Amino acid sequence: MAVHQYTVALFLAVALVAGPAASYAADVGYGAPATLATPATPAAPAAGYTPAAPAGAAPKATTDEQKLIEKINAGFKAAVAAAAGVPAVDKYKTFVATFGTASNKAFAEALSTEPKGAAAASSNAVLTSKLDAAYKLAYKSAEGATPEAKYDAYVATLSEALRIIAGTLEVHAVKPAGEEVKAIPAGELQVIDKVDAAFKVAATAANAAPANDKFTVFEAAFNDAIKASTGGAYQSYKFIPALEAAVKQSYAATVATAPAVKYTVFETALKKAITAMSQAQKAAKPAAAVTATATGAVGAATGAVGAATGAATAAAGGYKTGAATPTAGGYKV
């Protein structure tokens, strides 16, 4: 899933942010292009326009485009809240129905108050096309998935798209995964260093295996290393909701991939989640304590590598299930 999100972010950075130079002319303070006989000069900002707010404050929407994207973001959050209250198999259709209603209302209100003029029309058309592209990309990412996984795929893609679009308009949007991870209860963060160490052990074991066996070796090694580094209390790591969701999402991302690339997909997806958690933990406690915990975990987990590699065909313990049902982890709002 993380691999997919990185791809989405790169694609959207080009497809959604790129566009005609005059797309956001009003926002950056320039008027219509000057004629050949007249040098181009900056125009005065539109009435009521204010620059982006300082870091840490939520920028206030002032332009029509900013107001529209804020309404879209509000609809997104309302849809996530609605989906949270229904069974997993109904989350996707609930989200789509709720978000669709909110989006249609936002667009209708925008059209009813749309200012006249070629520049404004061009700017609104560009924003509308970007939002349309975001919806289509999110829908495409969810095609062919199970009802449970479809919701996660759709929301993950759409949240990235809205975040990038809102960023170009200097207004707040859905929080990125790295920020959301910080919401993990402090009491559970002590396990993250051990999980990080287990990941490194499993990756080392997988790197020495043939391409077609890397995924299976990594699964078995990761499972055994988790057990070793937590003193046998394997289930304790499952009490970290974000990690549990990340593991399931990472596994779901590999279902339709070839054996030779399954390992890369899974490893990259899980690495992103664990790295974000580790960074959040390091910011929350002294560096010395982090180093001591991580070093001890690596030593305990290393002993599991030999056995894990020899049992490359073993099932992936507690986190590999017959039908992965990822939960909305990194893109909670």
From Swiss-Prot:
What are the record keywords, sorted? Allergen, Repeat, Signal
Repeat recorded as keyword:
yes
Q: What is this protein called?
A: Pollen allergen KBG 41
Keyword field contains Secreted: no
**What are the start and end residues of every segment in region (2 X 12 AA tandem repeats)?**
309-332
Q: Where are the sequence repeats?
A: 309-320, 321-332
Q: Which family does it belong to?
A: Belongs to the Poa p IX/Phl p VI allergen family.
Show the InterPro entries listed in the entry. Poa_pIX/Phl_pVI, Pollen_allergen/Os
Tell me what else is known. Answer: Its C-terminus might be membrane-associated.
Q: Which domain of life is it from?
A: Eukaryota
Q: Which residues form the signal peptide?
A: 1-23
Q: Tell me, what's a Pfam family for it?
A: Pollen_allerg_2
